[in-house]
Amino acid sequence: MRFRGDPRGTRHLIHEFLSPLANRRDDGYGGTLLQRMRFLIEITDAVRDVWPEEKPLLVRLSATDWVDGGLTVEDSVGIARRLKLHGVDLVDCSSGGIVAAQPPSVGPGYQVPLAARVRQEAEIPTSAVGLITAPEHADAIIRTGQADLVLLGREFLRHVYWPLDAARELGAQVEWPEQYARAKR
């Protein structure tokens, strides 16, 4: 399966437009949430125009800035609703990036509640990220409907066979690619 995912939503220009902490513009791209999301919507429309309809389009959002006066998960629900209207198939929910503030507590799955809330309230599929390392944890996130997809970053870099090992740990029968047979434990 091929898809287009846009990782630029976290700690990058698009998030700088979305966050009221960074966006101090006084034109059509600043001010209200609707105006701050204008740049993202224009990019989304341009990508959707050239991206095949049968392939999913994903957008990463930094769902909260974790500080007063910053982007909130409520804002992100509104953004996700608008993205859905513009052809986005899934919102990947991350957090932070504008200021050095950290979430109240960082631990396995600490961003999962963001994905769950956006999924439920915006009625759009979401992906969960953030210190998800155990196959059972990833499986539980999907099975309980907190997200539709779990994305791994650092864990996959540390353990490139994670998907194959996770499938085995969860009792799924998978065939390892022939080239990887010697790496199978």
Residue spans for each PLM region:
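Flavin-dependent oxidoreductase catalytic cores
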Residues: 1-185
